Amino acid sequence: MAATATEKLPQLKSAVDGLTEMSENEKSGFINLVSRYLSGEAQHIEWSKIQTPTDEIVVPYDKMANVSEDASETKYLLDKLVVLKLNGGLGTTMGCTGPKSVIEVRDGLTFLDLIVIQIENLNNKYNCKVPLVLMNSFNTHDDTQKIVEKYTKSNVDIHTFNQSKYPRVVADEFVPWPSKGKTDKDGWYPPGHGDVFPSLMNSGKLDAFLSQGKEYVFIANSDNLGAIVDLKILKHLIQNKNEYCMEVTPKTLADVKGGTLISYEGKVQLLEIAQVPDEHVNEFKSIEKFKIFNTNNLWVNLKAIKKLVEADALKMEIIPNPKEVDGVKVLQLETAAGAAIRFFDNAIGVNVPRSRFLPVKATSDLLLVQSDLYTLVDGFVTRNKARTNPTNPAIELGPEFKKVASFLSRFKSIPSIVELDSLKVSGDVWFGSGVVLKGKVTVKANAGTKLEIPDNAVLENKDINGPEDL
């Protein structure tokens, strides 16, 4: 270590020792992360060693064997499964308070409602007990504990645990912010979803699931509506003894920054844009060379997680995330669960249909899933067969639509978009009910004017800049 790093660590360590809000596991995990960061163990990728993974490493979904119609085989597979949803995020970017998973998605049902309905249907149909586990952060824990009470009568065992709570570090002094009197939530941060492995282990839940005969955990973001239990993938992993599987899907131009899987020195590895040397960034973004990206749907063997966490072997790439909060420059160090792939034996990717990646990150995504482009059956959001184009319409809504409440108030009803290619809306625009959008549509209200799209209007390949264009 450099001299400064050698001085920084003991000073930070003694400050962390005095933070009573942290458990011993959190303290050692945090110091471990910081010392790796200070030692500069950032992983440098040698571009010339990168190889495109073969079909053995990234298995095409349609080449996987189907699961038989025999209900006993399905039950056998499901009895080995735990479903874990990453539930640490807040709905703040969409103007909502509380966990993002309680935003209403469709028909009055929230992300969490849909997840519970899906698992309950599996449990009822196959007479099994697939548990649902929610990994909360300190930001979402209290609210989530209250929310899950509504599911006590459902046929799903719901477990919750908290991911680690680490102190933000004041950048110029390199001390934990809470040690300097920052006692509210802003002094802390959850260290990314790479923390799922040690936190699941430290919660005691991992050992409990192993003792019940569970073998695999399916991890996914709670806002990905496409991340449903897939027996074909589970069967493949059990048969082939794959300790880790990452679902990837073909890139579109919207996904050029997403992490991709590569073969590197004989191992399968996640390559993120932050690891790419500047001179190769355009190549990384090319859909020709790097054709797939990580959906963050992950299937991981529970025994393998236990073994690797106990050996302290999961040294994922550190993502430094500098921020300015209340005028103070702070640093938070994070890791990603997908980067763990290279530590597991017999790890694979599976190239899945795009339908398994349907994230709701903004109100433009809500417009898609609330429209006639999708229907809701048994908690599953399925695509309307009437849409012939395999890709979804590109939707851009202006800042007036950013918050869920504003978005909902500006549409009397969600327009029909089955035949829409792209929609761009900006300014003070209001939609009536029964509106149909087709082809490429742009609606722009000039500054200071309110533009109302009348009930039952059909807009096909139109640029609307005022009432005269309707």
Swiss-Prot record:
For this protein, the Enzyme Commission number is 2.7.7.9
Originating organism:
Arabidopsis thaliana
Q: Where in the cell is it found?
A: Cytoplasm
Q: Which GO terms describe its molecular function?
A: UTP:glucose-1-phosphate uridylyltransferase activity
Cite the record's tissue specificity text.
Expressed in roots, rosette leaves, cauline leaves, stems, flowers and siliques.
**Enzyme class label:** transferase
Q: Which GO terms describe its biological process?
A: callose deposition in cell wall; pollen development; UDP-alpha-D-glucose metabolic process
Give all N-acetylalanine modified positions. Answer: A2
- Name of this chain's protein: UTP--glucose-1-phosphate uridylyltransferase 1
